Amino acid sequence: LYVIVATGNIYEDVVQAQAAARQGADIIAVIRTTGQSLLDYVPYGATTEGFGGTFATQENFRIMRKALDEVGEEVGRYIRLCNYCSGLCMPEIAVMGALEGLDVMLNDALYGILFRDINMQRTLVDQYMSRVINGFAGVIINTGEDNYLTTADAVEEAHTVLASDLINEQLALLAGLPEEQMGLGHAFEMDPMLENGFLYELAQAQ
């Protein structure tokens, strides 16, 4: 069970994350504040204000990892922590995540190219370096194909998701990321009323 917290205040995120873990959550994802992907630096320290999410900082990572370890002891299982390693500081955030014991990173340059107008060469180089780091640190990466379908029809544009999955797989392999650490993005976003919709989704996922 994958649960998202995003209050903007890391200390309030901790309360929500621990409550979610007690209710059965396996992975806690802390969404980043709006616009952090366009910051050319990583903010410092614990943060208590964000917009639509919480700043990704090394201290925030440490606070949340500690909180999940505490609740993990309480419930008798390990709780994974996920954050976002995309935008203009992919390698820096990858290093922070490796140092602070994160388990999963959303790690995809293509989203930044398509939706944030980030320079393609720069961000693909950044992605390569961040995936080398994630691979070495044992961090699982997720890619962001589900984002493409927020502005397009999931049937008509299914080929774009598939193409991106194949590109992301090859870029991850080139960076030395083991296959067991690859989480290629897919989301069930076809209209539930579509005839054979589930078969289409299943076929694409396979």
List where the protein language model places each region.
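Anaerobic metallocofactor- and corrinoid-dependent redox/one-carbon enzyme cores
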Residues: 1-206
